[in-house]
């Protein structure tokens, strides 16, 4: 279980709304040499194309490094364009339009889950156990099935929808991927609900980016706001996040499953919010029990070490501890270690046949660098 950092009236907690304070690793009980050695390994290319490493401890930056990769030249010799926002276009990946906004890919899903929690707390969504298809009256599935009608918001958050879906057995550049086909379609929601059901909802985990798009539509339908606008008003403004970009689908919905672009420092704010149980300063941004519920009833995944919560991966470590992992294609990783007061962010673009940064390695490097425990 997560042992969340206490946030009750502790005036010593630093809230980086206006920006992160920078300090030394040693002053915050971490070994700088260990962090530097890991950074050097990342920069060498041994673990693929890494764009940045950022480590927060006790609410301060203790290590930060960005690495240079010549994606313009690389894209000229690899792949073909695929989709409107293809993976081989340097104007879209890994940075947005020559800015420092980095693609988050499926890390976007964790933000979407937070929006659902806020909407439930605000009364826009009745509960986690509400039937999600009740909000899709404008759509009619070409594969009607009572199992789809029984699907709850909780089932969608935990990727146990029961929908027949495959996006993990092939590269994301493969046109037979359900995710790619969805992104190539004119109406992503219609594509998702047209897929046949394979299981009872809640029965089996199956990673499904289309499920997260259902949540985007749900937010729009229940709050009257596009997801991007809802997140801006109810999340980003509290955290002081002003510089971002979010892609939209052909029908105008926010691309909730992979369309967010952020700077690493702003992504770390989101992790810091979860580290502090959804509280930011004197403001309870997320429902008080939302972070706890994120991992309270984890589902098993196809990887024995990983479990899945509300659009977050859960990684056990130490004696009965759990790290939160927000993960996205290409090497986007944010690891939250509440017991150690650490948030670590890694960005990259490892979509090629190269070794890649492993989440367990990244987590263990952070744990091993702690010298005050």
Regions found by a protein language model. Give the residues of each.
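N-terminal leader/targeting segments and the immediately adjacent pre-domain N-terminus
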Residues: 1-96, 122-125, 186, 190, ...
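Active-site SXXK
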Residues: 59, 82, 89, 100-128, ...
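Short clusters of small/polar residues that mark proteolytic maturation junctions
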Residues: 66-67, 130, 338, 348
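Active-site helix/loop module of the DD-peptidase/beta-lactamase fold
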Residues: 92-93, 98, 122-163, 194-196, ...
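A small/polar active-site loop signature that marks catalytic segments
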Residues: 162-248
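Active-site-proximal alpha-helical segments within enzyme catalytic domains
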Residues: 211-218, 258-279, 332-348
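Active-site Gly/Thr loop motif
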Residues: 241-244, 291-345
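Structured C-terminal helix/loop/strand segments within mature extracytoplasmic catalytic/sensor domains
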Residues: 326-373
